[in-house]
């Protein structure tokens, strides 16, 4: 009893404190306060002045404002218990929060929220007060998303024949501004495929049915109005949260904004998403400790809402998150939707609190549509067709059990029971697979509400024709010039990879190799009739040809997901990224070779002339850049690390054998291999630098001017990189089959 009374007193005290805060806050938003009233008028005027809003939108906006003025009931907590008082206070706080953004919670939902437990209310208040108030009603171009009879098939090729597999079978639905649509179903039901189709990430020729945005088909111009958050968190692990969002703002926001305004926008997104505490923490990854999973997901969402998209698509935003973090993510999405955006998300198995945040629901099973409508009416619909839970359970859990055929705790119609008995007998006797539950639910949906929902989808969206045409506006210009993109991407690349270049493992590898070589060729005699230094020079050519190839191979395959994501959002020009990626590391590429040559050069007693030393450094540098080009070309062409490593091993071994040290005369029909070998040209240049004016030939190779070798290395540097660049141009950003 003591514990209960103390808990009730604590809850009531919190309720009274919250009520006082709300009372003082309501004074700030009252009509009598000129400053706050002016602020609201400023927001209203700014929104109404936006060309994105029609006269109908203005009327709706005025309606929301009128609702907002009456959305704050008097907080009379006298005579209430602790739980009831806290429930009343939380309802008022939610009403205040949504009215501040221009949207209000219906009175029925406020009353219903009082039935929640005290723990649920406390957690909802924390989520609401930490995120809802922060999202302001900023002008957003409205997008009314409709999809009717969506079908999608893939062709699977076998050894002798090919067959088509149906992934989506006539899916229909809609999502309008201010709504959160959830795509729910078991694994393999087609949720991600449908989301990709809605985001225009498939070749439109492979999709049946129609997807419309304000009654207009998809076009590339829509890329700037659609945000897409993938299931995997694609981020650079060594950048901080603040750096990640700042680079996104600088690259994606229009050039009409100054650099300071873009940085302020990034700071406001950090604040809106509640990332202030971790903004200076690295993102982290598999081998780098960083932010938590929920914070990483919020950073991904922040990258997409940075440009104020009208349509936001999210693939499993709550996967691998605990229930509390998942609730905060969905609460945040709910608030973003109420700010006038259209939100569509896939979700696997939400909790009951998450489920009640959804405005609309699509239930899929094996690519078939089992339900589309309001999420709040889903249980009523399935009860109407004879399927209802025997126990009190989470609605999402009930729906997933139903579509998966788990009928232990579910009441089903007798007709379905009879069919299930027959199917089980066939499964036992003939080993035949048939989803009788899916067939029954699909037929029930088609006969009950599918026709009515399609008729609703046929109605035109409530927008003026002028506003509809704005969705096909000319393609947005780049946020930065080519040179500015190059500089920014170079700086980002150096910050991201600075940890790899100077890792203790790489420095130890280079220094230990240099010391071993210096000891083996300790103070060798350059005037000897048998030049032993040629072996050292050849090894230097091989080492600095082998090392960069297998480092560069990983460049584009590892960054493929990031490159695809950023190119999908028109973040930068591919040419600016490629040049920045291949040139920003060049200063860093000089540090380890210089350190290597300083150790080897003086320990082995190579030619002690400043000119010879710097020419040796330049020769090794040309070899490194040429070898990197080969690695980049192989990696970009194959985009498969196993295949790329195998091909690179064979190529480097061939170049080494044809490098002029092991084989003096190569048969004429494969002599061209020698001229493609950067090892051969590097070795000849190093021999020239060390033995010029001392010997006319070394190991049977005449010492020439070196112009031919330098020209060959420069040609390789340019040629290999061109191959890599055009391979990236050909790279598919997403599956189109």
Swiss-Prot record:
Please state every residue range assigned to the domain named ABC transmembrane type-2.
484-691
Question: How does the protein's chain sit in the membrane according to the entry?
Answer: Multi-pass membrane protein
Where do transmembrane segments lie in this chain? 502-522, 536-556, 586-606, 614-634, 653-673, 706-726
Where are the annotated segments for Disordered?
A: 26-59
Has UniProt tagged this entry with the keyword Nucleotide-binding?
yes
Record's subcellular location: Membrane
User: Which keywords accompany this UniProt record?
Assistant: ATP-binding, Membrane, Nucleotide-binding, Transmembrane, Transmembrane helix, Transport
Q: Please list the GO biological process terms of this entry.
A: transmembrane transport
Q: GO cellular-component terms in the record?
A: membrane
Matches recorded under InterPro entries: AAA+_ATPase, ABC2_TM, ABC_transporter-like_ATP-bd, ABC_transporter-like_CS, ABCG_dom, ABCG_transporters, P-loop_NTPase
- In this chain, ATP is annotated as bound at 185-192
What's the protein name? ABC transporter G family member 27
Species the sequence originates in: Arabidopsis thaliana
Gene that specifies this protein: ABCG27
């Amino acid at each position: 009893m003591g514990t209960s009374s103390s808990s009730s007193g604590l809850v009531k005290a919190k309720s009274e404190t919250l009520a006082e805060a709300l009372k003082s806050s309501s004074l700030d938003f009252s009509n009598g306060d000129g400053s706050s009233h002016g602020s609201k008028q400023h927001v209203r005027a700014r929104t109404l002045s936006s060309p994105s809003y029609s006269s109908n939108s203005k009327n709706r906006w005025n309606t929301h404002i009128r609702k907002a003025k009456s959305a704050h009931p008097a907080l009379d907590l006298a005579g209430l218990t602790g739980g009831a008082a806290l429930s009343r206070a939380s309802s008022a706080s939610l009403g205040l929060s949504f009215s501040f953004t221009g949207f209000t919670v219906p009175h029925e939902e406020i009353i219903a929220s009082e039935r929640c437990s005290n723990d649920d209310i406390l957690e909802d208040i924390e989520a609401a007060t930490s995120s809802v108030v922060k999202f302001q009603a900023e002008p957003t171009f409205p997008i009314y998303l409709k999809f009717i009879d969506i079908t999608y098939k893939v062709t699977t090729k076998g050894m002798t024949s090919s067959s088509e597999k149906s992934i989506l079978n006539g899916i229909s639905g809609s999502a309008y501004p201010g709504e959160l649509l959830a795509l729910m179903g078991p694994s393999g039901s087609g949720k991600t495929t449908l989301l990709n189709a809605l985001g225009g990430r498939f070749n439109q020729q492979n999709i049946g049915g129609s997807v419309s945005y304000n009654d207009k088909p998809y076009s590339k111009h829509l890329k700037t109005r659609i945000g897409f958050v993938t299931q995997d968190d694609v981020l650079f692990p060594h950048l901080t949260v603040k750096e990640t969002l700042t680079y996104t703002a600088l690259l994606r926001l229009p050039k009409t904004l100054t650099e300071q305004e873009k940085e302020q926008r990034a700071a406001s997104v950090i604040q809106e998403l509640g990332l202030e505490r971790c903004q200076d923490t690295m993102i982290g990854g598999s081998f780098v400790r960083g932010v938590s999973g929920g914070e990483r997901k919020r950073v991904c969402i922040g990258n997409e809402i940075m440009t104020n998209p009208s349509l936001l698509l999210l693939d499993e935003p709550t996967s691998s998150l605990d229930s509390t973090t998942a609730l905060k993510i969905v609460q945040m999405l709910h608030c973003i939707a109420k700010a006038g955006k259209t939100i569509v998300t896939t979700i696997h198995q939400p909790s009951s609190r998450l489920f009640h945040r959804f405005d609309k629901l699509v239930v899929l099973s094996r690519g078939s549509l089992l339900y589309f409508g309001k999420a709040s009416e889903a249980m009523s619909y399935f009860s109407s067709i004879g399927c209802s839970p025997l126990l009190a359970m989470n609605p999402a859990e009930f729906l997933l059990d139903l579509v998966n055929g788990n009928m232990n705790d579910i009441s089903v119609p007798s007709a379905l029971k009879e069919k299930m008995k027959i199917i089980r007998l066939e499964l036992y006797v003939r080993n035949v697979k048939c989803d009788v539950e899916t067939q029954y639910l699909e037929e029930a949906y088609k006969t009950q509400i599918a026709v009515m929902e399609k008729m609703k989808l046929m109605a035109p969206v409530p927008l003026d024709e002028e506003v509809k045409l704005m969705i096909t506006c000319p393609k947005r210009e780049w946020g930065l010039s080519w040179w500015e993109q190059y500089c920014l991407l170079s700086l980002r690349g150096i910050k991201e990879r600075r940890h790899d270049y100077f890792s203790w493992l790489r420095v130890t590898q280079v220094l230990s190799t240099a010391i071993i070589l210096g000891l083996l060729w300790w103070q060798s005699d350059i005037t000897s009739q048998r030049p032993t230094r040629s072996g050292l020079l050849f090894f230097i050519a091989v080492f600095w040809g082998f090392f960069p190839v297998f480092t560069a191979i990983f460049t584009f395959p590892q960054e493929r997901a990031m490159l695809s994501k950023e190119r999908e959002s028109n973040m930068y020009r591919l040419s600016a990224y490629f040049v920045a990626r291949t040139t920003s590391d060049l200063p860093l590429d000089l540090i380890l070779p210089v350190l290597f040559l300083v150790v080897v050069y003086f320990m082995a007693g190579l030619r002690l002339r400043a000119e010879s030393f710097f020419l040796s450094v330049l020769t090794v540098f040309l070899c490194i850049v040429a070898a990197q080009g080969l690695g980049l070309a192989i990696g970009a062409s194959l985009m498969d690390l196993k295949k790329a490593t195998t091909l690179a091993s064979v190529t480097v071994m061939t170049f080494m054998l044809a490098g002029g040290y092991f084989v003096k005369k190569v048969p004429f029909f494969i002599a061209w291999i020698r001229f493609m070998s950067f090892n051969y040209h590097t070795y000849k240049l190093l021999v020239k630098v060390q033995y010029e004016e001392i010997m006319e030939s070394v190991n049977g190779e005449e010492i020439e001017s070196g112009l031919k070798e330098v020209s060959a290395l420069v040609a390789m540097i340019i040629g290999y990189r061109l191959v890599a660049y055009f391979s990236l141009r050909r790279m598919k950003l997403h599956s189109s089959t």
